[in-house]
From Swiss-Prot:
The keyword ATP-binding applies. The lineage of its organism: Archaea, Methanobacteriati, Methanobacteriota, Stenosarchaea group, Halobacteria. The active site is at K255 (n6-amp-lysine intermediate). GO terms for biological process: cell division; DNA biosynthetic process; DNA recombination; DNA repair; lagging strand elongation. The gene is lig. ATP binds at E253, R260, R275, E304, F344, R421, K427. One of its GO terms (molecular function) is metal ion binding. Gene3D superfamilies: DNA ligase, ATP-dependent, N-terminal domain, DNA ligase/mRNA capping enzyme, Nucleic acid-binding proteins. It comes from the Archaea. Belongs to the ATP-dependent DNA ligase family. This is DNA ligase.
Length: 561
């Protein structure tokens, strides 16, 4: 498929408001993609690589601006790109306004597509893969050169969507649900079969190709693969009354203040994945050793990595973040902060045939299998199954006395649904719920804080899942050291500045507390946080897993009850 054809479909989709029409257009795109279907299924969502892939593009805004300005000719520099971006707020619109192939500088907005259409979808994918592979001395220059080469071949429309793609901001209103429904519509397979295949594979391209080439039976035959991560099942806030009214009895567990970890062990290799499916094996060698010595393969285990002191008591969440994703000085940090595995679910376990998927088994059965594959019982969560609210309260009190965060309430009969934040897992905390929000802007501080960012604009994911809506600003709860560290963290993601105001690429997620959620016309979400306060940087989250407007609306509604 020509990249220009993909860009035309993207433009048509972007101009469409109705959800059903979007799905129909995406289905038409998939039907026309031919051998490029796997790539197109990712590109349309703004993804270059499969969600489970360890390959990352690692292109910041400044690198993109440099490549764009070089393709636009000697009369345009990166500052010109930033200035134009400050006016439009859309890197795609800026890229589309440049006369790239002609090397003649800034063109009028809405410029035509006069250049020869030579780019293909597969060619773009190959060049971006080469860009991602660039490493070591001179890699940044190599990335600029490769990206310049792509932009230099682009028409205006192609540049619009290529620029968005490389920065992960496709912004055409296509979320995961639309892609799922489009696969079903394009290849005449049940939506439920597509959903199930996506849950076990986490690969939209693979599922799309399987649906097209082999149909429903092949989708139904897809299963978990040890070594390939799946999305974690998630919990929503709830009460003991909610649980007992809905399920009649609840499985109660301690809620650990740690980082989610998914353990894959095939008998030879142990691989650990974060909640975002990032490989964190190298950062947690003691967990690897524990699994090798105490777990029967093949297995996929869901659990929590928890930092502990010398007595085995839990340390605050911030301590585990000092270990998570660490690539240097791992041995030294291990001496300072030890990490323990607290396993609470089993997705795949040994069987007579080699291995068995357990996603459809009830939680009570999965937990029983978990106990059978982990020799060290202390590493497996304690579960109380009861219909007695007083017993649950006593269990919660014990968990809190032990320094833990609270309790989890789970439906004993529920299957494991990857990526789903449903009503079968409820988290009960003694404190008001916090929100995990994306930093999309900031303001420079004043006085002694004039050299650092002092106020941060917060956004939640929109309903489509590929954009963000503002919900408030936070400046409370950060020390001078935290402000400096957060400013350094955000600096590579700055897109433009206008006086005290800074526009920031969505990249960093903050956990934010608040007193109340109020309706407000001040922010694009229609809501504002009353007395927001910084709690922590969510190192284990990305913008795609931050909280949604839907969750904000639900929490706001709960306040009124």
């Amino acid at each position: 498929m020509k990249f220009g054809s993909f860009a035309t479909f993207a433009a048509d989709i972007e101009a469409t408001d109705a959800d059903l029409d979007v799905v129909a257009l995406v289905a038409e795109l998939f039907d026309a993609a031919d051998s490029d279907l796997d790539v197109v299924a990712r590109f349309v969502q703004g993804r270059v690589f499969p969600a489970h892939s360890e390959t990352k593009l690692d292109i910041g805004p400044q690198l993109c601006y440099t490549a764009l300005s070089r393709a636009a000719g000697r009369n345009v520099d990166a500052d010109d790109i930033e200035a134009r971006l400050a006016e439009t707020g859309d890197i795609g619109a800026v890229a589309g306004s440049l006369d790239l192939g002609g090397q003649t500088g800034l063109a009028a907005f809405g410029g035509g597509d006069d250049h020869a259409d030579g780019l293909t979808v597969s060619g773009v994918a190959d060049e971006l893969a080469a860009l991602a592979a660039a490493a070591g001395d001179g890699s940044q220059s190599e990335k600029v050169t490769l990206l310049f080469g792509l932009f230099n071949q682009c028409t205006s429309r192609e540049a619009r969507y290529l620029a968005r793609l490389v920065l992960g901001e496709m912004r055409i209103g296509v979320g995961e649900g639309a892609v799922r429904d489009a696969i079903a519509e394009a290849f005449d397979v049940p939506t439920a079969a597509v959903q199930r295949a996506l849950q076990v594979s986490n690969d939209y391209g693979l599922v799309a190709e399987t649906a097209r080439d082999s149909g429903t039976d092949a989708l139904d035959a897809m299963g978990l693969e040890v070594g390939r991560p799946v999305q974690a099942m998630l919990a929503q806030a709830g009460t003991v009354t909610d649980a007992l009214d809905e399920w009649h009895e609840a499985a109660v567990e301690t809620k650990f203040d740690g980082a989610r970890v998914q353990v894959h062990y095939d008998g030879d290799d142990v691989v650990l994945y974060s909640r975002n499916m990032e490989n964190v094996t190298g950062a947690l060698p003691e967990l690897v050793e524990f699994v090798e010595n105490n777990v029967t393969a093949p297995v996929i285990i869901d659990g929590e990595a928890v930092a502990a002191d010398e007595d085995g008591d839990p340390l605050p969440f911030q301590e585990i973040l000092k270990r998570f994703r660490r690539k240097h000085d791992v041995a030294a940090m291990r001496e300072e902060i030890s990490v323990e595995l607290h396993a609470f679910d089993c997705l795949h376990a040994p069987s007579a045939d080699g291995g068995e998927d357990l996603l459809d088994a009830p939680f009570s059965d999965r937990h029983r299998r978990l106990r059978s594959v982990v020799d060290d019982a202390s590493a497996v969560s304690e579960v109380l199954v009861t219909d007695d609210a007083d017993e649950i309260a006593a269990f919660e009190a014990t968990a809190l006395e032990g320094g833990h965060e609270g309790i989890m309430l789970k439906n004993p009969a529920a299957p494991y649904t990857p990526g789903d934040r449903g009503k079968d897992w409820l988290k009960r905390k003694p404190d008001v719920e916090t929100l995990d929000l994306v930093v999309t802007g900031a303001e420079w501080g004043e006085g002694r804080r004039a050299s650092v960012l002092g106020t941060f604009l917060l956004s939640a994911r929109d309903a489509a899942g590929d954009g963000f809506e503002t919900i408030g600003k936070v400046a409370t709860g950060l020390t001078d050291e935290e402000l400096a560290a957060l400013s350094d963290r955000l600096e590579p993601h700055v897109r433009s500045e206008d006086g005290q105001t800074v526009d920031i690429e969505p990249a960093v997620v903050l956990e934010v507390g608040y007193e109340e959620i109020q309706a407000s016309p001040t922010y694009s979400s229609g809501y504002a946080l009353r007395f927001p306060r910084f709690v922590s940087v969510r190192e284990d989250k990305t913008p795609t897993t931050a909280d949604t407007i839907e969750r904000v609306e639900r929490l706001a509604a709960q306040q009124q009850q």
